[in-house]
Structure formats: structure tokens, C-alpha cells
UniProtKB/Swiss-Prot annotation:
Protein name: UPF0303 protein Bcen2424_1558
Organism, scientific name: Burkholderia cenocepacia (strain HI2424)
Transmembrane regions listed in the UniProt entry: none
NCBIfam families linked: PRK02487.1-4, PRK02487.1-5
Entries under Pfam families matching the protein: HbpS-like (PF03928)
């Protein structure tokens, strides 16, 4: 895995995966799409869609644990704080040889810079929330969310996917 290349690709994902508008009905549709995709693949994950301050969709699939819910919360907090994907922030920390606690004073009990939470961005409004998955390895969590967003927004996932490591 080339961190610099992944960071560039994640930046392109974040720029491309923007909703023209977003409301609870769209959250429900996206959440159900993610649930169906995860179920078809046998993923034991938790899925979470929020606007900051308001939960819109949550599902824990068979095999997901309460620990996944806590990872969701901590990853979501990273997106809320930085307005970037949790995986991008984690890769930046890895590049710097630092942690969120070291560099930003953010407690590990509240923030997890691991892949899986992606900014929910609306054209003209910016980042208004997050879409999060937890239960797979962090890169796979990130790509699961990106793949679902591509399908929801009509983008070609093959174009936006991270390079295979």
C-alpha cells in the first residue's frame, strides 16, 4: 500500500461522492442499500448514517457486536472533527508517526482514526454528517462505504476504488 497514493485517491473520492441533496428518505435508501450489500457478502458489520447531531440509519448485521457500535461512534467522531474520512486521517497520522492523542490531544476512547467513516457531503452545504461501517479490516470498511456511495450516486466504483494492495 502506497500511503501517498491512497491519500490522493481518498481526496478524489471525497470530492466526487457529493449528494445534490440529502434527507432522511435518502439516508434510509442508502442504509438499506448498504445492508443488502453487506448481507449478500456475509459481512458481520454495523452501519451508521448520521447528520451531525441526528441519527438517520443504524443496523447491526448478524455477527456484529457492541464493540462495532463503539468503533462506529469513534470513527464518526473523527469525521465530525476533521470533515475528512477517518481512513484519510489515519493514514496522515501513520505518515507523521503520530496518533490523534499526540498530535491533536484527542482521546483514544472517543476518536478512532481507522478506516470506515466517510464524510456525508452535500453540494452547496459541505460536510453535514457521516456514513460509517465497522466490522471489516479498516481499508475494507472504507471501501465498503465508498462502493455503496458510488452505487447510490451513480459513479463507477472501479474508477474511484483504492488500488489493490
Amino acid at each position: 500500500m502506497d500511503i501517498a497514493h491512497d491519500l490522493q485517491s481518498i481526496g478524489a473520492q471525497e470530492q466526487a461522492l457529493v449528494f445534490p441533496h440529502f434527507d432522511p428518505a435518502r439516508a434510509w435508501a442508502l442504509g438499506n442499500r448498504m445492508h443488502a450489500l453487506a448481507t449478500s457478502r456475509g459481512h458481520a458489520i454495523a452501519i451508521d448514517i448520521v447528520t451531525f447531531g441526528q441519527p438517520l440509519f443504524y443496523a447491526a448485521l448478524a455477527g456484529a457486536t457492541p464493540d462495532n457500535a463503539d468503533w462506529v461512534r469513534r470513527k464518526r467522531n473523527v469525521v465530525a472533527h476533521f470533515r475528512r474520512s477517518s481512513y484519510a486521517i489515519g493514514l496522515r497520522m501513520q505518515q507523521a508517526g503520530a496518533t490523534l492523542a499526540d498530535k491533536h490531544g484527542l482521546p483514544v476512547a472517543e476518536y478512532a482514526s481507522h478506516g470506515g467513516s466517510f464524510p456525508l457531503t452535500v453540494a452547496g452545504a459541505g460536510v453535514i454528517g457521516s456514513i460509517t461501517a465497522s466490522g471489516l479490516p479498516q481499508r475494507a470498511d472504507h471501501e465498503f462505504v465508498v462502493e455503496a456511495l458510488c452505487a447510490e450516486l451513480g459513479h463507477d466504483y472501479a474508477v474511484l476504488a483504492l488500488a489493490r494492495s
